[in-house]
Amino acid sequence: MRRVSVLCLALLPLLGTAPAHAGSGTASATVFAPNPVATLQDESLTDQKDADYPALQKAYRTVTLTHLDGSGYLHGDYAWVDTSTGPLATAPFTYHRDDDRFEQVMAYYWATQAQLYLQELGFTNVNNEPQQMKIGQYGVDNSYYNGDHSHDVLRFGKGGVDDAEDAEVILHEYGHAIQDSQVPGFGTTADSGAIGEGFGDYWAQAVSTRYAPTPDEPCIADWDSTSYTPGPVHCLRRTDGTKVYPRDLVGEVHADGEIWSSALNGMRNALGATKADTAIVKAQFSFTVDITMPAAARVTIATVQSLYGSKAASAATAAFHARGLA
């Protein structure tokens, strides 16, 4: 979930080659939606070394995996899952968290949902590919997007709550793939890197809310963060903060990204989810790899103006102004 890493562009060992479009098979599966803490509203839940203990049972959901290629593996139109920790998951995809293959199912389902939401918003050619994902990266408790354009991969770590057990960690990383699809190499400076982290958090909120709404939507990665936050409420980060640009910049892209995510969330509250999400994604086509937050705010406001008119643009301006960006 990029707690400490920056965008990694190193060349890494290649996974199996994924076709451009694999198929449209379906299968029943068991997942968290989005995670046990958010679903059950229980901040006392902890990892307990991957134990599938009784308090977690009501957090599981049965879903339908779509766009599978019929191979029996988690390979499909929009997601292509590999692992460094044991066998590949095969049907039936009804694992629980005490089996590492559960995380593979989570990755496939939520990456597919992220792409389907993009298409629902009208974006049919943004990261529209079998997004490669590898679970259990080196046993390290960190996840990240590797943006090597010959072979871009989302990699999910282990330790504490394994990262791919939390849908919002998966969706955050998918957010980086979205931006890299729109603006190759995006995030080369402090500000643009913070925009990347902020959008990743916002995208996690947007997609998890679309498919599995919970009461505290701005709290990102409630489950994964139980392993490294003191509580009483566990959040990796929030999208409803009060940080202001440039006063509250600290020079760390994840922390500074809360300025951007909170501006986007303010716009969402003003315009509604569909209008805000459409404008936010569309605006990113006009970003540069090194754009500043104020410049990105101006581009986003102009996009709102072009899509929805002056009243909506004024509401978007107010959301960015509250964060010092307009």
Regions found by a protein language model. Give the residues of each.
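Zymogen propeptides/activation segments of proteases
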Residues: 1-4, 16-170, 177-199, 205-326
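Hydrophobic core
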Residues: 9-17
